Amino acid sequence: MKVKKDRKKYMLAGAALMVVLAAAGLIGVLLGGLLSGEDNPNLALGKGVKATCDSVEQEALSAAMAIDGNDADRTSRWSSENNREDASHFIQLEFPEEISVSFVVLKWERANAVSYALESSVDGTAYETLAAFETAPELLRQEIVLKKPVQTRFLRLSTYEVSKESVDYSDLYQNVSLYEFEVYGDKPTAYKLETPVIIKAAEGGRKLVLPETPDGFRVTLIGADLEQVIGADGTVYDTIQGKDVTVGYLVEDTRGREETREVSFLVHVPAADAVPEEVQSDAGEADDALENEQADVEVALAEDGQGAVNACPGWVIPSIAEWKGGRGSFYLEESARIIVDMDSRPYGKEEKTDPAGGHNVKTGESAEADAQTVWDVAELLSERCGKDRDFQKRLPVLEGTEEDVKPGDIYLGYAQEENGLGREGYTCEITDKCVIKAETATGIRWGTVTLMQMLFTDWNEGKTAPQGYIRDYPLYEVRGFGIDVARKAVSLDVLYTMMETMSWYKMNDLAIHLNDNEILATSGLTGSAEQAMTAESAFRLESGVLGVQAEGDYPTPQEYAYTKEELAQFITTAKTYGVTVVPEIDTPAHSLSITKRYPDYALRTSGESVDQIDLGNGKAVALAEEIWREALDEESGAFREAKIVNIGMDEYYGDGEQYRQYLTRINKQAQEAGKTVRLWGSLSNMGGTTVPSPENLQMNIWSTDWADPQEMYEAGYSLINMQNNHLYIIPGGGYDYLDCRELYENWAPNRFYDYNRTETIPAYSPQMLGAAYMIWNDMCGSLDIGISEYDLYVRFLEPLGVLSVKLWGADRIASDLEWQTGRMEQLGAEELAVEPYYTVNMKVRLEENPAESNKPQIIAEGDCAYGKWAFYAVEPETGKVGFTREGRTYIFDYTLPKGEWVYLKVEGEAGVTKLYAGGESFFLGEEKEVDSLGSGEPFEEHATFVFPLQRVGEQTGSFDGELELYMGGNGGGALHADPLQ
């Protein structure tokens, strides 16, 4: 586990390269102009230095402002003209005589230059390029280290292109701006460190050491991006494949002459010799095989008749971190067994119930309540074998040892010794049997997921896996997804499906946003505070404090809520799948569901503020604490099984110091209940003197304006990348789908970038936890456009594979996005709850005189968590054909005649439902070119309908007539050969 260090420092990256991009100290914390004491002054501040430029935005922002030593004042900077047509600019420093330059610091106002160069000249006529860049600076403070000292009189920064990523801002920011242009004759000591080397340790094994520590400096290993390869103490673990690892060191001047810095190195770790004999093979063959990007199971035959070394199974998502190929295949036979090691039994097998069926997992009393067991993992593996449409056999789960394993069996057990695998790593030895080991049950779960992906693919009818040895582990600790279940009700069944699908891709963090309201600024209801109080809102959790009931039928989605027991059980069950559920109660903003019940506690600075709690009101703060006390109660609280809870804290527009004090109180309350706390980062935008402790506090970086990543990193907070412009989904809104190609080709979990800046937090730091994407159901209330649970699921699933690859961090990933997404489509997650497309053909005859003329005539219906789920022959309000789902009713402009047979066809697609009747077509959804769009309600823009078959025709007791119904799917293939009559 990486050890967090609270420190202020500079951060250096890639010290072995000619050009080094480095981080700044805290924004607003200005470090001295001298980087190496009096011996290495900023030469740009010297006497007689002139600064010139091609243009200025305004006269006061001249080139001279970039060499005045003042980087604290926003008015003391150079800014070029704002020219949308031409972003070519320069600023030049002319020195009175030749100087030697080794190190340059550029302090950008905005990191928006995406093509620029540092140039040098001795005569002001002929220039040479010292460093060229085709991407934006990683941080606002950019440090450039030259490969060797350069003699010069003229030093010029030339820019050629700036970011146009944001249409809204592109007209305003077509210029470049520098606070300071600093020049140094020598480079900081941290840049002079030699690359660390791997040696054999005296006690055995391998160790990473620095060749030499400079006199007067203390150098401490911070960590490695792959701590499963290089541990926190420098131990180099036994790898089976060569790995490139980035390590970071803290460099401190014990004399106080230089600033404290972080420096990083790229270290190649060769494979160790400790590989089981059964899978050892010629190193040359194995290396060649690992270069093979083919994603098939076939094993080529060598000329001597022996099987060639197996390539890494490329169809596994995310890709395997380390692979050593063997020869031949493992076959899953019907006689196979799952053997669970006897020492892997923390408590009795008899105490377990089916971990998936009915979503009911019983937790044993003698084990940690928040940890799944190997028995749970084995049961999930057995169940998945039974669900496979070709294999269809649950494997028996037996107690035993590794010696009991026979050919075709699968063994699950704890590793007998620590080898750097950590909480989620595992090994998998595949010969004629399969042996999966890990230090935790979570690691064993991920090993079984890899095995299942090998075995259960549509094209692998033989249920085989290539023999070989796997050592696999993630790059990032948090690999997540979050969903807003407040603005749109989301059934518990859908949450279970999402959780199980995440587990299939080794995504391990599911955030549930439980309370919110429609955005008041767009609601049209802000004429007064009282009017704003009528906006749509929801608190989706049973609460005695707020009077939220969560039992019985829910005729409308607005009333739907989870019981305390349902949520606690969901959190517990998810652990069995290796997924941490993070429940959230969002205050002090986004709290209309609270202030509606307690209107005196609302912030009333405007009509738009009444969804915020007035933190100047002591009773309002006490109410929030009582809500949390109920949720955290160790006996009955909905969050009692959660390891991490989210306390909200975003977009508050009240007093900054009151906000900081409130954050500190709620954080303390949750941590005293034994929880790690997560929140939406907002401290960069909320002034005040109180500094919340970063201890056990995780921060979602959703907006770089509300929480600057570098500033928060310097303050010691643990960070999760949830940057809105890359990772937010607003179904039907501005962020309708994620840009998977952008994520695949340019995005990185530790990189925060937009039109204004680019900041990279080191992956080797324990503070850089990972990333998550999020669905926000902003299109609710007055903006409701009919998004369904299926629409949510489609948007959830599409980027899942790409993000799992990036967050797991395997370096063997496909270079082509279509090939990558193609692999996702081949796999299919475990038992998805919905089918994407269908066709229903039916013959319908309504009675001329039904028994009850005003009752609905239902062709088919199904059970649902809230509202009603049915397809109408006669919708009771209009008498027309239609359907209802999730609290919304959709009407086709067609009325069935009575007493005669009519042929109907219904086609369901994402966003569109089509009815064909009597030679006419009736569409509901986005295909507006078709006549008869129904009632014209805004929610009909998204008319997705999953056709129910739980109860059909007369089985409902709500259909007077005769019916024949045929169901088809995926291009018309029949699911039922005979009509359902």
Regions found by a protein language model. Give the residues of each.
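Extracellular glycan-recognition modules
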Residues: 832-887, 956-981
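Active-site neighborhood of glycoside hydrolase catalytic domains
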Residues: 604, 609-696, 703-705, 709
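Short, aromatic/His-centered strand-loop micro-motif at the edge of beta-sheets
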Residues: 882-903, 929
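Feature activates predominantly on carbohydrate-active enzymes
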Residues: 419-610, 619, 629-642, 779
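Aromatic, loop-rich ligand-recognition surfaces of beta-strand-rich domains
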Residues: 16, 32-38, 71-129, 138-188
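Short tryptophan-centered beta-strand motifs in secreted/extracellular beta-sheet-rich domains
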Residues: 510, 570, 842, 900-908, ...
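Acidic, contiguous N-terminal accessory segments
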Residues: 31, 266-442, 446-450, 454-471, ...
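Flexible glycan-contacting loops in extracellular carbohydrate-active proteins
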Residues: 924-967
